[in-house]
Amino acid sequence: MSESNRLRIAIQKSGRLSKESMKLLRSCGVKFNINEQRLIAHSDNLPIDLLRVRDDDIPGLVMDGVVDLGIIGENVLEEEQIERERLDKPASCIKLRELDFGACRLSLAVPNEFNYEDASSLEGLRIATSYPNLLRRYMQRKGITYNDCMLKGSVEVAPRAGLADGICDLVSTGATLEANGLYETEVIYRSNACIIQSSEVQLPAKQALIEKILSRINGVVRAKESKYILLHAPTETLEQIVALLPGAENPTVLPLNDDTNRVAIHAVSTEDLFWDTMEELTKLGASSILVMPIEKMMG
């Protein structure tokens, strides 16, 4: 396949999305070897090039048509789109789907001694952030004026360093805020990782490959959310047992050798099978209950 037909995918070089992005692509059957000294990795089995770049470069690379796909946090994507619209630059891309990793929230936080009532408590104060556009949009909607302090990292130390009165930063568990004497006050944006596509993809072969990769991603994500359930059940309580299986659709029911009073049930559940459900199944006479993870799903 010619160089122009090779699919170019941008992912974060290092950081919280990097490992999960590579794990996802490998789960989709994309084989590649990463050389930490190189920014480009070529797939061994598919016409795909992997570009490892800074996360805040990914949206622009996709929007400008430099790469075809990007795996990025929704917060970074939204921040870049707002900035490009403000500068009247191309800001369109196709969001193919949200992914099941990279969950975080962009929140306002203030020092523990700060008497916070609502967002208006920040009127006229200085707020440190790496996401000035998302912060500005939120504060404008609230009708609050403030001064911003733009930092590319270590935002959480700004109040102690005397640089700002509060911060607007990404929060996962809140442990970093607590360690720096801060507490979370408002969530202004919730984010997951997502996969985006350039609006400029035109070659049929490349679009077909994108659809193949997306289908595999859908299968991997569905498999993570599903469990394969096997059990033996008395025929007299079969309907009750099937009704208890969460998210099960048309389970397979098979006869057991030399036992006309019991059957085997195989089912895919798209919900968690909790212990209390398993105990209810047991009360109805179910036995040999197995709940197993699924690696891949299709169809």
From Swiss-Prot:
Entry superkingdom: Bacteria
Keyword Cytoplasm part of the UniProt annotation: yes
Function recorded in the entry: Catalyzes the condensation of ATP and 5-phosphoribose 1-diphosphate to form N'-(5'-phosphoribosyl)-ATP (PR-ATP). Has a crucial role in the pathway because the rate of histidine biosynthesis seems to be controlled primarily by regulation of HisG enzymatic activity.
UniProt protein name: ATP phosphoribosyltransferase
Pfam families for the chain: HisG, HisG_C
A single MF term (Gene Ontology): ATP binding
Record-stated family: Belongs to the ATP phosphoribosyltransferase family. Long subfamily.
Pathways involved: Amino-acid biosynthesis; L-histidine biosynthesis; L-histidine from 5-phospho-alpha-D-ribose 1-diphosphate: step 1/9
GO BP, sorted A to Z: L-histidine biosynthetic process
InterPro entries linked: ATP-PRT_HisG_long, ATP_PRibTrfase_cat, ATP_PRibTrfase_CS, ATP_PRibTrfase_HisG, HisG_C, N-reg_PII-like_a/b, N-reg_PII/ATP_PRibTrfase_C
